[in-house]
């Protein structure tokens, strides 16, 4: 039988305590980690209800876990903590997946990037009490690398889990400071690139990463346990440098020298060959460029947003003017875009985002409304009745021509937006629609405007009417997954929108109530007169069920 390589540490060696006085970590009587001015940002308060219940289930099932903040790229200098990071024994992966599903957590995957073998598993859950989304970053391996690719996988998971400590204030297990410091030091050292050396030679000050400074402060100059750990894992030369950095401050020169000492051991834990990591990183950089170029399709405040692996979701907000539709839509976008890639699509005919073809018409309308009071009623958007006077017939012909141009431009825009909705949903994105095309009420409320011309004696007008109605008929097949109907009494809507006529509001509210969708679409009626907080909470619950 072949002997193991000299750099492979036996499992018992990795699980050996760091020092005689170091606690085993699994005892609940262990003191919580100390806090101070330098580590105030690293302290985690009591976990939310969803996370607390999840941790209780893990403890009941005797699954070893610990909170792990070993990824500097998730916690940049100016970034706020994005959820909870935990490390779990990979032998319990199936049991953990079942527990997460029972606890209400849903899987999310990174957008526009290939799977990373050393990466994390991201889960999301809805906190029912406050309506916020809880993020959970689950890892089974300890991998190091930059934000695009993990290059090394350190087999130190048994050591981390066997030396964990119970943070009684946070109510969860955390990593031993000595283990966390050594891991962070290795990560920072192997993250140094040629650019880091050039900036250092040019005199640019090197700033020690925040998380490494926090763990360094918690060690309080006690280099004994971390030096012993470094000697066992990386060798005597690396241990001497670690002792100097714990007693003093991690500097660029010492970190670079530490890298030289650790290279013979750490390079044996590479995930790829020497050239493999380089071309994979280049390919991922191209993916990032492609993602940035497609930002028009997937507008999200966070470029590292997640997608739904089970398929995207389209959500449509319907409601008359004064129902609070715009306010609720903006709030929903802000709530979702912090965790998932979201795409807002405006299907209305007002002043919202429009196509290049309809934009000049909106500008012309804006100018005409200042000069002609009759334009405020937008006569080109409705059909006119018969008239006998020559002047009236001439005016009707002009408005009919304007109506034709407007209807064609609007149909062209809706056709493109329906294509965008289909592409985004097929890619796993969440699409939030302001209004939605309908084919049940012509000449009204996002319906076709030229249906009355389908029986016109002129063949050209019949063809235009047929072409204009195509996207509205297509919308009957490309239906949203969730339709939220916002209902409000016409008098309440008029108080919110004084410029609207009461009869018009009544007509629109009746049309919203009469809209019907296929069985595959979930339709929810919402009383928009309730307090905003209650309406928002109900909308969030409905949206979360569909994701």
Feature-to-residue mapping (PLM):
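NTP-dependent small-molecule kinase module
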Residues: 263-287, 485, 490-547
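Hydrophobic positions on the alpha1 helix immediately C-terminal to the Walker A/P-loop
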Residues: 328
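A glycine- and Lys/Arg-enriched "phosphate-lid" helix/loop adjacent to the NTP-binding pocket
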Residues: 430, 435-514
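P-loop (Walker A) phosphate-binding loop of NTP-binding proteins
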Residues: 320
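Conserved NTP-donor binding/palm subdomain of two-metal-ion nucleotidyltransferases/polymerases, i.e.
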Residues: 13-14, 30-82, 88-313
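Conserved lysine of the Walker
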Residues: 325
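ATP-dependent small-molecule kinase phosphotransfer cores
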Residues: 351-459
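Short beta-strand-centered segment that lines the nucleotide-binding/catalytic pocket of NTP-utilizing
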Residues: 339-355
